[in-house]
Structure formats: C-alpha cells, structure tokens
Amino acid sequence: MNKYTFIFEVGWRDPQTGRLKPYEYRKKTQMSINDARAYARRLANTQNVLHVRFYKEMY
C-alpha cells in the first residue's frame, strides 16, 4: 500500500465563547489514504471540532 504525507486542517470552536478558533494544521507522514480518513474521522469526533479537511502533500 502506498504511503503519503497528509496535512490536516482542523476547525475548532472555543468552548467558553463559542467563537471559532484559528485553524490548526497537523502534518502526518507515512500514512495510507485509509489511515488518513480514519484519523480525520477520529479528529472530527473530538469535542468542539467543527470540521476536518485533509490534503495530500504534492512534491
């Protein structure tokens, strides 16, 4: 299975004010596409997460 580098964009909501926090970016290497989808689902199920986007890094 092919391994890639993915960049995840996470949109958070501040629990106290309800306002959107600045996006957080996480870079993960050596992940398959299925692993990236599972990681994005796990992040999306975290409390106060509004959305998760992920991009495959191109060289």
Region locations from a protein language model:
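A short, exposed loop/beta-hairpin motif centered on an aromatic-Gly-Thr core
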Residues: G18-D35
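Solvent-exposed strand-loop boundary residues in beta-sheet-rich modules
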Residues: D14-Q16, M58
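Short N-terminal "domain-start" leader segments
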Residues: M1-R13, R53-F54
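Short, mixed-charge low-complexity intrinsically disordered segments
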Residues: R41-Y59
